[in-house]
Amino acid sequence: MKFKSLITTTLALGVIASTGANFNTNEASAAAKPLDKSSSTLHHGHSNIQIPYTITVNGTSQNILSSLTFNKNQNISYKDIENKVKSVLYFNRGISDIDLRLSKQAEYTVHFKNGTKRVIDLKSGIYTADLINTSDIKAISVNVDTKKQPKDKAKANVQVPYTITVNGTSQNILSNLTFNKNQNISYKDLEGKVKSVLESNRGITDVDLRLSKQAKYTVNFKNGTKKVIDLKSGIYTANLINSSDIKSININVDTKKHIENKAKRNYQVPYSINLNGTSTNILSNLSFSNKPWTNYKNLTSQIKSVLKHDRGISEQDLKYAKKAYYTVYFKNGGKRILQLNSKNYTANLVHAKDVKRIEITVKTGTKAKADRYVPYTIAVNGTSTPILSKLKISNKQLISYKYLNDKVKSVLKSERGISDLDLKFAKQAKYTVYFKNGKKQVVNLKSDIFTPNLFSAKDIKKIDIDVKQYTKSKKK
């Protein structure tokens, strides 16, 4: 009985000690980390914040349309950010953990709204214990150099450029297919790489390829020859090819099923878009792959499609535009101008091979000029940061300094995280309005008294915002 009593007492003490340790640990964690209201269980949902990011691989940047999503005002660790960064590296560029470990360099930079930044090594596996608030992050840039310095030339990599054409539309690809130099590879291995970039760059899966009208890739060799491979056949030649002999690879997929199965020549016609007097360089072309002969009604539909895709101009925008037309330039020197809003089409047919280029011109109505964009700078405690965006000010009527105050406070909050309360306790908070006539007006952001003067947004040249905060004394 004494033995049983001893065991019972020992177990009880162990439970109490364990409970006490857990309680102390939780208490210490709660004391070390401030309560994050966005993650409280009292709330039914989270308010998210979108943080833009860029990826640079071997010196080549890629335009990223998506953003990293975090809970607003959440305190997170650098390990949490690293997991997000590794995820988008794998999803957007196919770079795995192994690739990062074997890379020459792999790092990401966190840019903060106060103008500071922090560089983190993705290969180190060492994390600082600091926590950062998601609302303080302005952007994240990821930089990976996968090119290991080869100890001998036999181990160097070869980069093979490739293009992807889907339904007649080409896309400019900034990355390359990577192979070991002088590596003998099979067409099956090559097909695996091609299918991988089709899925990562254009979202085309194996199922999409099987159901497509046509799916093939062309291997262009440095000796001038080429070989076309059907991605749907599943049949592979036993020949091996040397990676150093490949000049480029062209991938072509037509996902549009048609009744006719005749293979026809693919005609590409270059085009440009001029919107409100500003032209942009268009890397893709208009394609006439299935029917080189077309009427002007179909051509107008294609023009409207690229306007929507490239510049976001809808049918409604064209309807209210001041001007909306396109000019077809022919190889024989002739040209034809067609109105995009007209419903009357000539019965003439045009052959794609006769078209030299197409210029699209759109001038939007007064709706596009309803706002004026004024450049501005922000200096906090004497440190300025370049602002890529501009202050959007209504151009419809005369504005007051109270209206301008609200705009300035809004960008201070969004760009540098400075709230109304921060301004109230700031040492100094003001902005200077520079007018085009050479005059200027200094406005105190801490004052609620405004001059009754009204002025037009078109008269403003620029705005400089200056905030000086009291420095916090360090606790000893």
From Swiss-Prot:
Pfam families documented for this protein: MAP
InterPro entries linked: MAP_dom
Stretch forming the signal peptide: 1-30
Keyword Translocase (UniProt): no
Keyword Secreted among record annotations: no
Keyword terms of this UniProt record: Repeat, Signal
MAP repeat intervals: 45-153, 154-263, 264-372, 373-476
Listed name of the protein: Protein map
Organism this protein belongs to: Staphylococcus aureus (strain Mu50 / ATCC 700699)
Taxonomic classification: Bacteria, Bacillati, Bacillota, Bacilli, Bacillales
